[in-house]
Amino acid sequence: MEEVLDREYEVEYGGRKYRLKPVKAWVLQPPGKPGVVIALFKLPDGKTIRKVIMKLPPS
């Protein structure tokens, strides 16, 4: 997870694009479904949004 937090991602919100580093990231994997990595991003205007940044292969 450390490499996910150190990388910048392109986040689109309200028609604008930002290059931001995530504040927090976690894996969401319901039973029997492929998982995803979700990250929280803090926008320059103070809003916090979450976005799927990676899909995990089915296990």
UniProtKB/Swiss-Prot annotation:
Gene Ontology annotations for the cellular component aspect, listed alphabetically: chromosome; cytoplasm
One MF annotation (Gene Ontology) recorded for this entry: double-stranded DNA binding
PTM summary: Methylated at multiple sites, to varying extents.
A Pfam match: Cren7
Major location (coarse): cytoplasm
Keywords assigned: Chromosome, Cytoplasm, DNA-binding, Methylation
Subcellular location: Chromosome; Cytoplasm
Subunit structure: Monomer.
Function: A chromatin protein, binds double-stranded DNA without sequence specificity. Constrains negative DNA supercoils.
Family: Belongs to the Cren7 family.
Protein name from the UniProt record: Chromatin protein Cren7
Gene source species: Pyrobaculum islandicum (strain DSM 4184 / JCM 9189 / GEO3)
Lineage per the UniProt record: Archaea, Thermoproteota, Thermoprotei, Thermoproteales, Thermoproteaceae
